[in-house]
Design a protein with these regions (language model features):
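Conserved N-terminal catalytic/coupling substructures associated with nucleotide/phosphate chemistry
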Residues: 1-175
Length: 175
């Protein structure tokens, strides 16, 4: 446990136990880590005071985590389950890598939601970030998106003239 900072951050999240009945509570963090810069969910540490309480039945917890990530996150991100013991207590570190196939969605009840990590929170990705994640997953940038305009139909001179005309900076002599 001494390898982990004692505070939640952009790349670490503490969970006292696996919430089997509320998997969204931690699966959104898996999505957020995969869509951002990766991170670790550490099971067996109480969130409020960072007290190491350990886990009961580490094998069952590991199996359930793996099953739910594989079923509920799409595409499945790179992740590792690292069970370990400290002071006679069992813990599970779930290391989630950031991935190239963004966005990584959490799926539930027919709805897909992409999350990002912001500070110590996992938040639903706003539209502009979701669009950037989609482009990243396609290995594209905004500059690389095809346009409907032909190169000969656009120029900085034409843009400048149109802007001045629309802004009323050019007086039309015919009026």
């Amino acid at each position: 446990l001494k390898d982990f900072d004692n505070v939640e951050s952009t790349n670490i999240d503490f969970k006292e136990f696996l919430e089997k009945d509320r998997p969204k509570s931690w699966l959104k963090t898996v999505s957020a880590f995969a869509n951002t810069k990766g991170g670790t969910i550490l099971y067996g540490v109480r969130d409020e005071d960072r007290e190491p309480v350990g886990l009961d039945n580490i094998a069952e917890v590991s199996s359930k985590v793996s099953k739910l990530i594989n079923c509920k996150i799409s595409p499945v991100p790179r992740y590792e389950l690292n069970p370990f013991e400290d002071n006679g207590k069992d813990f599970l570190a779930v290391n989630v890598g950031d991935g190239p196939e963004t966005p990584y969605y959490y799926s539930s009840d027919g709805r897909k939601t992409a999350y990002i990590r912001s500070g110590d929170q996992s938040l639903e990705a706003p539209d502009h970030i979701l669009k950037a994640l989609i482009l990243k997953g396609q290995n594209k940038t905004y500059d690389g998106i095809a346009t409907e305009y032909k190169l000969e139909d656009v120029s900085f001179t034409l843009l400048d003239a149109t802007l001045k005309k629309e802004a009323g900076l050019i007086v039309n002599k015919d009026r």
